[in-house]
Amino acid sequence: MKRTGAKLAVYALEEIGVKFTFGIPGVHNTEIYDELNKSEKITPVLVTHECGGAFMADAISRTTDSIGTLMIVPAAGMTHALSGIGEAYLDGIPMLIISGGVRRDTGKFYQLHQIDQHKILAGITKKSFLIKEHSEIVPTIFE
C-alpha cells in the first residue's frame, strides 16, 4: 500500500525527533493534521495566530532537544509567522517550517493563497524547499 504525502511527512518528523508542531490547520494542510492527530510521538498544538506559533516553535528549539516545528497554510499563514521565523533565524535557532501549497497541475494562477513563499523566506531562512514528488518528502525533512 502506498503512503500518502501526509503519512510520509509525519513519519519523517517522528524519525527526526519532533515532539510538538505549532500552527493552524487549513484547507492546504488538513491531511497532515489528520496524520499528526494519529501520531503517538508528536503533539500538534493549535494556535490562534501563526506568529505566536512561530515563537512557540522557537521556544521548543531553545529549551529542549527537539526541533521547533511550525505547521502553517501558505501565503497568509506564512506571512503572519514572519516575525517569529525571523527572530529564530537572527538568533541562529533551528526551526522547521512546513507550509501547505497550492495545486500546480491545473494551469490556473492566482489561486487561494498562491504566493512566492520561497522568495519571501529567502532572507530569513537557511533553506527553503519546494517538494513536487512524494519521493522528495522524507529526504527533504531529513536534510
Task: Give the location of each predicted region.
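N-terminal alpha/beta PP-like core and its mobile active-site loop of ThDP/TPP-dependent enzymes
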Residues: M1-E143
